[in-house]
Amino acid sequence: MMIREYTPADVPAMRALWRRVFHESEVFLDAFFRLLPDIGSAVVALGESGELLGAAYALTGFEWQRRDGTRAQLGYLYAVAVDEGARDQGIGAALSKAAAELCRKRESAIVTTLPADGPLYAWYEKAIGTRYLLCREAHTAAARKTVDIMKLTGTEYMLWRENLLRGRDFVRLSYPMLEAQRALCEAYGGGLYATEDAVLAAYRDGERLIVREILCARGDPAVSAASAAAALGCSEAVFFLPAESGGEPYVTADAPLSPGTVWNLTLD
């Protein structure tokens, strides 16, 4: 087996593997692979005949912005995938280590990831040393339209977001990374939105609206989340807020991020 950084010639096989493992929307995959050179890179594992055994993505379009003005680039491991016939051979761990190292070579000070489920937090800690957590709290709101919702472009959302997060520790997204976030939301029936008091990024999951980020100037986030759910034909909204203590595990990192750091917009 050989692990190396991907080349454009690898993309068709990488897309096919992604579809088999994650059953992802073609709309999102089109956008993701178009944006990949601007948001990071990837590593691939190849068999003896050059066949693709697995892939992992090393994304670097995130910057930790602290209220004291200091900044640090974050690397983010995403979509580690191994073909079914090549599993249980340590390929996933090897790809994760290679992707983490690629993040560091691309000047990331901290390597992070969002494990898909609970047992994977320990798996990633063993593989790449990610033992520090950001946590969040989940909330629900029944659909009820009390404020108007308007759709935003990526540029509009970025400007609103930066303004609402001024004076807080937060993770800034590069514009191409924000476009990847928008593509993910729109591929599943959502997008980037604003009310008179808030901005939110959301997508549909059946009858639920999954609000991946909601930022309010002063009001109750449940009001805007409920209105967005009603506007998009959902029965309820599930939204998440950063937790300074307690809450459910969210992003895990190989160095500590300040409690309450606002990230929200990872790639799920």
Describe the predicted segments one by one.
Residues 79-82, 88-103, 219-230:
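Conserved acetyl-CoA-binding loop-helix of GNAT-fold acetyltransferases
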